[in-house]
Amino acid sequence: MTTRFKLCSFKTCPWVHRAAIVLREKGIDYEIEYIDRHNRPDWFQAISPHSKVPVLIVDGEHALFESNAIAEYLDEVAEPRLHPEDPILRARNRAWTDYVPNFSQVTHISNAVDEDDFNARVEKAQIPASRLEGALEKRGNDGPFFNGEKFSLVDAAYAPALLRFTFLDRVRPTGLLDDKPLLTAWRDALIAYPAVLNGVVPEFHDVWQDQVRTNGKWVVQFLPSAAAAE
């Protein structure tokens, strides 16, 4: 009997995107249900201890939460395996996957309230970005992905933040990656990868821009007007 999967999501959530990338890369069919983040239903809060997405519902009865746990579960139950076979490499991948919350502050740059705040957020993001550049220098391969030619779970973990950062960087350049050629190349490979592109809603760039406009922060002035975008 085929296992049934339902992914509970917000349309712009990077952590859901990570789970969706893994599902797409493994060719797993799944249903997606979007939750109103401003009015989260009781049934959802009952299965999500943090009242957050993603939640993966398996066969209508098992609710898994936290993107890392979901990704690891999917890698255990479906081919192709997205973790390296070598135990040292696998542990290293998991360690750098645990670093994603530090790096994901690049997605918060768009929340700056003014130019000074914007510059401060970019400067703060230099530390995790530089450390990630250093990790890529020591990975022992030429890419394009973290482990070389094969797309892995660690790639799925970083792709959502890098895609959203790139949207921002194109409308209001940050200079964050100017001296980080390996991180730039990795970013370019990830944001062009089919599972990454297919793991979000259609016209996701427009959806992201709409969210930024709704937030009403300083970077809104650099977006094309909604009328022009249409």
Where are these regions (language model features)?
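GST-like domain detector, emphasizing the conserved glutathione-binding G-site
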Residues: 1-146, 217-219, 223-230
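Short amphipathic alpha-helical interaction/hinge segments
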Residues: 104, 108-111, 164, 169, ...
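Alpha-helical scaffold segments in carbohydrate-active enzymes
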Residues: 95, 99-102, 131, 159-164, ...
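Short acidic/histidine-centered micro-motifs embedded in hydrophobic/aromatic stretches
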Residues: 96-99, 110, 159, 202-206
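GST superfamily/GST-like fold recognition
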Residues: 146-172, 179-185, 190
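A contiguous, mid-protein "functional segment" used to position or interact
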Residues: 174-209
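Long, charge-rich low-complexity segments
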Residues: 197-229
